[in-house]
Design a protein with these regions (language model features):
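Short, flexible active-site-adjacent loop segments at beta-strand->alpha-helix junctions, enriched
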Residues: 10, 74-75, 98-100
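A short, histidine- and acid-enriched strand-loop-helix "catalytic/donor-clamping" loop
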Residues: 44-45, 95-100
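Short, glycine/charged-enriched secondary-structure capping and boundary segments
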Residues: 19-21, 52-53, 83-86
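A short, charged, and often flexible helix/loop element on the N-terminal side
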Residues: 35-63, 71-73
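Short catalytic/ligand-binding loop motif for oxyanion handling, primarily in non-cytosolic enzymes
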Residues: 14-15, 47, 77-80
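N-terminal subdomain of nucleotide-sugar transferases
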Residues: 1-43, 63-67
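Short N-terminal targeting/anchoring amphipathic segment
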Residues: 56-83, 91-95
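Helix C-cap/helix->beta junction micro-motif
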Residues: 32, 88-90
Length: 100
C-alpha cells in the first residue's frame, strides 16, 4: 500500500471549508488505495512562531526519505525555509485551496 503523509495546521476536525476540503482529499486518496497518515502542525499557522516552525521542521525530519508529503497551504506558505530544507529528501506537494 502506498503511503502519503498529510500535514495540517490546527484541528482537522474544525468545521471550516478548508479543513473539509482537506478531509475530502484524504478520503479520496484512501479510496484510491493510499494510506494517509495525518500529522498535525501548530494552530498558529499561517503566522507561526519560532516554536511552531521548529516543530514543523522536526515533523518533516522524522519522515522517511522519498516519502510523499502533502502540506496544507495554510502552513506551506508560512514556512518556506523549513520546506526548502527538506526538498531534496522528500516528495513535497502543496494543497493550496485558499491562497493567502
Amino acid at each position: 500500500m502506498k503511503t502519503a503523509y498529510f500535514l495540517i495546521p490546527g484541528d482537522p476536525d474544525a468545521r471550516t471549508g478548508g479543513y473539509r476540503y482537506d478531509r475530502r482529499i484524504m478520503d479520496g486518496l484512501g479510496n484510491l488505495g493510499w494510506r494517509v497518515m495525518l500529522r498535525r502542525l501548530s494552530a498558529t499557522f499561517p503566522q507561526p512562531d519560532a516554536a511552531a516552525l521548529r516543530a514543523a521542521d522536526a515533523a518533516l525530519a522524522e519522515l522517511p526519505d522519498r516519502a510523499l508529503i502533502i502540506i496544507d497551504g495554510l502552513a506551506l506558505g508560512a514556512m518556506p525555509d523549513v520546506v526548502a530544507a527538506h526538498r531534496e529528501r522528500l516528495r513535497l506537494v502543496g494543497l493550496v485551496h485558499h491562497p493567502l
